[in-house]
Amino acid sequence: MAKKVLGFIKLQIPAGAANPAPPVGPALGQKGVNIMEFCKQFNAKTQSEAGMIIPVVITVYSDKSFTFITKTPPAAVLLLKEASLKKGSGEPNRNKVGTVTRDQVRKIAELKMPDLNAVNSEGAEEMIMGTARSMGIVVEG
């Protein structure tokens, strides 16, 4: 018989840097998950992407075991990295803080494709460009 699912936990954790401190510890502790075991597995799986924020969905089962799925970094984080910025604009409609090229948007869209609900790459690019606009980043080309 399959294990009964107790719940799901969604977190965004820096790659290779999961530790028992908040927000990881309290979120997992509430469901009774072995926090150190999760941290070891997550850090081992995401070591190659150091420095990026990685969304993770943790499935917790009734016997306190767990599985997790890592997703691609958020589009906003990827756009900031491509534009070499620390943060987006506080007033995106007035203050533009950086620019990215259409090729950079295409690269981000291809990377994000598995997590986006887009039919094709053009739709994915439009989503990424919308995110860029809402952050005050101009898309050239």
From Swiss-Prot:
SUPFAM superfamilies to which the protein is assigned, alphabetical: Ribosomal L11/L12e N-terminal domain, Ribosomal protein L11, C-terminal domain
Post-translational modifications: One or more lysine residues are methylated.
InterPro entries reported for this sequence: Ribosomal_uL11, Ribosomal_uL11_bac-typ, Ribosomal_uL11_C, Ribosomal_uL11_C_sf, Ribosomal_uL11_N, Ribosomal_uL11_N_sf
GO molecular function: large ribosomal subunit rRNA binding; structural constituent of ribosome
GO BP annotation list: translation
Keyword annotations from UniProtKB, A to Z: Methylation, Ribonucleoprotein, Ribosomal protein, RNA-binding, rRNA-binding
One GO CC term on file: cytosolic large ribosomal subunit
Regions crossing the membrane: none
Function: Forms part of the ribosomal stalk which helps the ribosome interact with GTP-bound translation factors.
Oligomer and partners: Part of the ribosomal stalk of the 50S ribosomal subunit. Interacts with L10 and the large rRNA to form the base of the stalk. L10 forms an elongated spine to which L12 dimers bind in a sequential fashion forming a multimeric L10(L12)X complex.
Family: Belongs to the universal ribosomal protein uL11 family.
Protein known as: Large ribosomal subunit protein uL11
Species the sequence originates in: Pelodictyon phaeoclathratiforme (strain DSM 5477 / BU-1)
Gene this protein is translated from: rplK
